[in-house]
Amino acid sequence: MNIEKIMSSLEAKHPGESEYLQAVKEVLLSIEDIYNQHPEFEKSKIIERLVEPDRIFTFRVTWVDDKGEVQTNLGYRVQFNNAIGPYKGGIRFHASVNLSILKFLGFEQTFKNALTTLPMGGGKGGSDFSPRGKSDAEIMRFCQAFMLELWRHLGPDMDVPAGDIGVGGREVGYMFGMYKKLTREFTGTFTGKGLEFGGSLIRPEATGFGGLYFVNQMLQTKGIDIKGKTVAISGFGNVAWGAATKATELGAKVVTISGPDGYIYDPNGISGEKIDYMLELRASGNDIVAPYADEFPGSTFVAGKRPWEVKADIALPCATQNELNGEDAKNLIDNNVLCVGEISNMGCTPEAIDLFIEHKTMYAPGKAVNAGGVATSGLEMSQNAMHLSWSAAEVDEKLHSIMHGIHAQCVKYGTEPDGYINYVKGANIAGFMKVAHAMMGQGII
């Protein structure tokens, strides 16, 4: 494999798409050795086919705001790869959304979904529409207008979206309702639905729950008990909430959360009503965490900074891509962090990842750590297909088993001669091998 040649070609075809190119390069570096052991992959040009999406839909979304003024946004759906199942991946509503971000997320999703062992391909979609500051009626009208274009490309065996940043249960409900009206079918075409119409128990907290199950497995490989360990978390939405809830349940102490305005440090631990307050902060729509310090004496708000300067045993990025950089990694390493688990997608910069691996710090990438969310989406698809509903305990048990299996795959492919587990390499190889063999088995298409 000539990585330099492949990347040069992609950079020429997709200039400026930094997030997408970063994601592709990371995977290629990890799989180079094993790819070169399979000449049949090169003959079938597996890499060249895998790094480009099957198709991309870009469309205008026109809607009317509460003032009666016409607004326009861009909508996207990237159907990346369906070698192992229907396209599966969330929809993101945020002002920062662009094609590069969605292609990176769809590419990552392809491998993440493969790791779950469930039959799901990779995809991602979204819009540069931001729900922040919008009324409920405006959000409903936008979701309906968005689906007027996208519905024709979706289906339970074709492409199954879910939520993501800016898209929660409310937005999924509005989109599913419009899809149902347009198709006149009630099928499992969306996941993350309300419990009353086909949703799965523990789906909102599944990404955070699964992340902690994975991190706990990482610690156990070193004989370390998570009980009593301090945890630094970024973000304060559903993912951070789920992570904080499960970390506390496992006996750890969460000491930070963060938002665009800065971070909260609570040495007494964020548990009980404090965890519930995270959801109140998110529901307020203000996108700030500063009010936490006013609500709970003994905690401190640090404006304009990220939580990685706090001494903690475990660091869990739960907010967005590239939120933990090289300087942050140095701070964590200097503070003797035991484990870093990306619960956000591509939460660490390449420089940060290199530093963790160089210092033999336990680090695992988002495609493995945060796979609990899409795994539970897959379980929701299964429940919809069988027209039944599992209990929370059943779903949680299956989620725990899936995360245990993902960790085992990472250990299998990522263990180095000195015993260090390179989870980046392990996750990339495990996901790639499944997708590559599936593509080989289906011919040149």
Curated annotation (Swiss-Prot):
Q: Can you quote a single GO CC term?
A: cytosol
Q: What Pfam families has UniProt attached to this entry?
A: ELFV_dehydrog (PF00208), ELFV_dehydrog_N (PF02812)
Give UniProt keywords alphabetically. Answer: NAD, Oxidoreductase
> Per its record, what are the GO molecular function terms?
glutamate dehydrogenase (NAD+) activity; glutamate dehydrogenase (NADP+) activity
* PROSITE patterns reported for this sequence: GLFV_DEHYDROGENASE (PS00074)
Q: Which residues of this UniProt protein bind NAD(+)?
A: 235-241
Q: Which reaction does it catalyse?
A: L-glutamate + NAD(+) + H2O = 2-oxoglutarate + NH4(+) + NADH + H(+)
Q: What class of enzyme is it?
A: oxidoreductase
Which family is this protein grouped under? Answer: Belongs to the Glu/Leu/Phe/Val dehydrogenases family.
Quote the protein name from its UniProt record: NAD-specific glutamate dehydrogenase
